[in-house]
Amino acid sequence: MEGAAPPASSGSEVTGAGSGKVDAGGGAAMEERFADLCKSKLGLDESITRQAMQLFKESKSILLSSMSSLGSGSPEEIERFWSAFVLYCVSRLGKAGKGKEDGGISLCQILRAFSLNIVDFFKEMPQFCIKVGSVLAGLYGSDWEKRLELKELQANVVHLSLLSRYYKRAYQELFLLNDAKPPENSAEPNAQASDYYRFGWLLFLVLRIQTFSRFKDLVTSTNGLVSVLAVLIVHIPVRLRNFNIKESSSFAKKSDKGVNLIASLCEKYHTSEDELSKAIEKTNTLIVDILKKKPCPAASECQQDRLSFIDPEGLTYFKNLLEEDSLKLSLLMLEKEYENAINTKGELDERMFANDEDSLLGSGSLSGGAINLPGTKRKYDVMASPAKSITSPSPMSPPRFCASPTGNGYCSSKMAPITPVSTAMTTAKWLRSTISPLPSKPSGELLRFFSACDKDVTDDITRRAGIILGAIFTSSSFGERICTSVRSTNRIDAIWTEQRKMEALKLYYRVLESMCRAETQILSGNNLTSLLSNERFHRCMIACSAELVLATHKTVTMMFPAVLEKTGITAFDLSKVIESFVRHEDTLPRELKRHLNSLEERLLESMAWEKGSSMYNSLIVARPTLSAEINRLGLLAEPMPSLDAIAAHHNISLEGLPPLPFQKQEHSPDKDEVRSPKRACTERRNVLVDNNSFRSPVKDTLKSKLPPLQSAFLSPTRPNPAAGGELCAETGIGVFLSKIAKLAAIRIRGLCERLQLSQQVLERVYSLVQQIIIQQTALFFNRHIDQIILCSIYGVAKISQLALTFKEIIFGYRKQSQCKPQVFRSVYVHWASRSRNGKTGEDHVDIITFYNEVFIPTVKPLLVELGSGTSPNKKNEEKCAADGPYPESPRLSRFPNLPDMSPKKVSAAHNVYVSPLRTSKMDTLLSPSSKSYYACVGESTHAFQSPSKDLKVINNRLNSGKKVSGRLNFDVVSDLVVARSLSDQNSASAAATTADIATKTPVKLEQPDC
């Protein structure tokens, strides 16, 4: 079939680069340039230069074959990227000296030497690691990725970027940046107001390194930053204040002695008084030790003007700390201290974040895919969750960033904007106020559930929780990367780790009790043996609780999926409990629900398909025809490690934990189940959640009254008597694949909308992907769902005779929120011995090669079947629309019902409606001429105007009492209308046919921005 033929020009369509081939002479020239740069420009010593040259030579062949896979695709830029990556790997993994005096090199030096910025570096580095992973493993060992700490450093950069913006906004709110009234009696040249700003940021950086260890969580770092603000308020001259301490609403907490500064800052920045007091104490200690300043015995007597109307309780005043004659010296001392601290392997100079114009910062976002920062997605993304229960019932969530002319994300409103840092602090407040006060042991009601089982499971559950949480929250996980000389850091890390462990334990018991309570109401009985004795279920619950605690504090060294490795479960296991966990914790903040939503998407889109996923242990039972391919690729999961093995591996002390019984209860561990997916299972299961979402795409109906969690943790081969003889594996895989289909529908809708494709094309793409899920499931093995979607869109475009290139599809995909360049640059393939290209074994290729060599040979029959109903001209399309599909063509699957996009009324007293912002309208808003027609919550509709003014105007209009002569009719805006109008929202004519829309609205070919 011609329509299914591969594109004529493959690789160039995706990357836009040239042929991508460089001869051997060019490779030799690259080596010479790299060696010269190491010696002359960077001045590296012989040892590190030798190691760098070795890695460059061994990876040169990969570089020469990948000349279109990095950056813009130009050979010169790719060479710069590759050289920078080589040097960074050597600096982190090599045996060279760690400091500058030993010939070491920092990341900042590398970036400046190759004219790169930090954003581009982290966006392209994963592609380098994928391609050169085998070389790095051969040179530096199999643990090279862990030692490289790339994800940790990237998350650290994201945190510093957020904290610098947070500090800048707070400083500008509290102090003047320019001194309009310098002191008249000063003989010294007036200290620049910006020097105080620099002092605060440097003090924070030194505090963060010396006291909090190098990779610390966002909440602890924010507490340290607020402590620095407290020091600045006490010491910066009063003339530079932007507030009146007596009248400011920001300092409303007062005592008999004046304003309670610590309590006021805690209320303003959502910190804990106890934690802030400790942070201030650490900051004061640092000032004494490093700046050699002595605190005044009585703070209120040392500086009357700066401490007037302020309660000195808990505060320390240092004489001459920020006076003009000592400020410069204090800055120099902090600079020296910081430089000494960062002169280690591959460190980043974090001082650059205080300078918005630093060329190393670059532009763009680093948060996507690396770490999940709260507040970076709109409500629509939450509504589009494959699990309905994760969505919030509230009508609309405001954007987390306010737009400003400078693009820094700050509002000029007096009301503090909602930022990732403020959201993290608010979420931490929930953990502190709701979870921390709970007991660290099971409640009386929960103990009754435990004892009501066939065998009392109390000891088993408490012992398991102690071991698993001990493995997750070990001091080595958070404190092993310390690069300071402060001896108390280990003790501080141990205290912090124990606090987080207790929070996770309390949350686990709380949600488990809620689940048990709901279960007994359904069953009218307290015997929950089958649920409470399941090892894998409890590990998933503990992992989910720990992940929420880690996500709340935004830890850097224990980012997801670290909890999976620590607990011995897989992504597929965790996906079974997310929906129920959210459903049974009513107080869970919206940001944590969003976090779980994003995790579920990551699990579904790729992680559950990775090698070693327990999904394959069920799939091999549910689909025996796939067993040969699963075994050929070695995809089956390893047995889940025992609790004793986990305790021994992490050196967990079992003191205080219940002893392990000599004989395991017959219902409890999944030991046998993990070793063999065909284990006979005798447990019975209870009803936990509604079964409406538990529909298999293979079965027309699922007669089982059992919900997903009911059979989720059973043996895959156990028959489900309530499901018409269907095996538990079939039930579980059916649920999983139905979620995959829904996620695919959401992604297809978003991308087809951006590409302005017709509804007919959209439904064909969805039908094709659905058929691939059912009939060619192996295409997803070890791959990303977006890779299948991209190829499906191109294949359908070919059979529909649309003038749509792969480059245009990739350009549109780059603008999607879930875009990751490695999705289309590195697709997993396992060449069979009979492959026509002569290659064998595992490999990673670009999306075009995958489309030509793997996708089309596999999917061509489905495309032929789908394309047999394609009309060649407008007349036939009109006939098809009127008469339905041709008899010989399969009936297209109707596009599934997706979350409601209708406007929602947000006020009972006024006719005010809010609707989610669609992708196409978001693009329209980028036009200044069109932007004024829309009002976005939290985003100004006019340049240099704060959102508060917009809202004030709206309120004035609503409260003016002036009657509107006409009514807005929202009745026509329904799910059906929205689903059918995805492709023509920006169309000039409502009467245009779907073929006209598909062929007359080409994608603009611009420089990709992702």
From Swiss-Prot:
Query: Quick one: a GO biological-process term for this protein?
Result: cell differentiation
Basic and acidic residues compositional bias: what residue ranges?
664-679
What residue ranges carry the coiled-coil annotation?
Answer: none
Q: Does the keyword Electron transport apply?
A: no
Please name the SMART domains in this protein's record.
Answer: DUF3452, RB_A, Rb_C
- Family of the protein in this entry: Belongs to the retinoblastoma protein (RB) family.
Q: Write out the function statement from the record.
A: Regulator of biological processes that recruits a histone deacetylase to control gene transcription. May play a role in the entry into mitosis, negatively regulating the cell proliferation. Formation of stable complexes with geminiviridae replication-associated proteins may create a cellular environment which favors viral DNA replication.
Annotated protein name in UniProt: Retinoblastoma-related protein 1
Organism encoding this protein:
Oryza sativa subsp. japonica (Rice)
